[in-house]
């Protein structure tokens, strides 16, 4: 039995998220269906990070086991021919049998893209959040400093979050401006349900001047979701990278735009 790693890109608009659901199409379902056809046997996959409805990925990492005798090209080109246009395999490699895309990961990287312009973009409308009011990214980055390290993120988890602990370790949280785009890059060991989008919603209030950077610290300390801002929309969020002990994968979304 061999263990294979896949690097996947997908546009999440038409899916209920990564995880297989009985009622709606999912990225996992489409991928497993195509892999199973190439392998001529049932294939189940594990991913590095389960994205929510409407969230995208430029570098989702997946692994699966199979004893089917197929060249690596079959796992990429053959499967891609069966996948829908909005899901594609970018790379494939054989890895150690102990490798697990989820549990071997050291950290994960997400980008949230904001199009900060007086006029909306027809081209980028489905790819990023449009904000027509000017954002102060210096204040937003000041607020980000309160997010670093291992902390209780209860104020930024959804009511449906099933994690048995609200603690997460954030190694990087930063806004970067490139032209009309503002990119929020966040790196952490893992993330709670809706955590990044809830953070973005609150950081936008700081950027628009409705709250001070220190307000983020206050919201963290009260450990109450109702004290934070509304959840930012899903279509601006991208899973862009994973780091493992021996290698890493990262494709920042802004580098694909600009």
UniProtKB/Swiss-Prot annotation:
<dbReference type="InterPro" id="IPR020095">
    <property type="entry name" value="PsdUridine_synth_TruA_C"/>
</dbReference>
<dbReference type="GO" id="GO:0003723">
    <property type="term" value="F:RNA binding"/>
</dbReference>
<dbReference type="GO" id="GO:0031119">
    <property type="term" value="P:tRNA pseudouridine synthesis"/>
</dbReference>
<dbReference type="Pfam" id="PF01416">
    <property type="entry name" value="PseudoU_synth_1"/>
</dbReference>
<feature type="active site" description="Nucleophile">
    <location>
        <position position="52"/>
    </location>
</feature>
<dbReference type="GO" id="GO:0160147">
    <property type="term" value="F:tRNA pseudouridine(38-40) synthase activity"/>
</dbReference>
<keyword id="KW-0413">Isomerase</keyword>
<comment type="subunit">
    <text>Homodimer.</text>
</comment>
<keyword id="KW-0819">tRNA processing</keyword>
<dbReference type="InterPro" id="IPR020103">
    <property type="entry name" value="PsdUridine_synth_cat_dom_sf"/>
</dbReference>
<dbReference type="InterPro" id="IPR001406">
    <property type="entry name" value="PsdUridine_synth_TruA"/>
</dbReference>
<comment type="function">
    <text>Formation of pseudouridine at positions 38, 39 and 40 in the anticodon stem and loop of transfer RNAs.</text>
</comment>
<dbReference type="InterPro" id="IPR020097">
    <property type="entry name" value="PsdUridine_synth_TruA_a/b_dom"/>
</dbReference>
<dbReference type="InterPro" id="IPR020094">
    <property type="entry name" value="TruA/RsuA/RluB/E/F_N"/>
</dbReference>
<protein>
    <recommendedName>
        <fullName>tRNA pseudouridine synthase A</fullName>
        <ecNumber>5.4.99.12</ecNumber>
    </recommendedName>
</protein>
<feature type="binding site">
    <location>
        <position position="110"/>
    </location>
    <ligand>
        <name>substrate</name>
    </ligand>
</feature>
<comment type="similarity">
    <text>Belongs to the tRNA pseudouridine synthase TruA family.</text>
</comment>
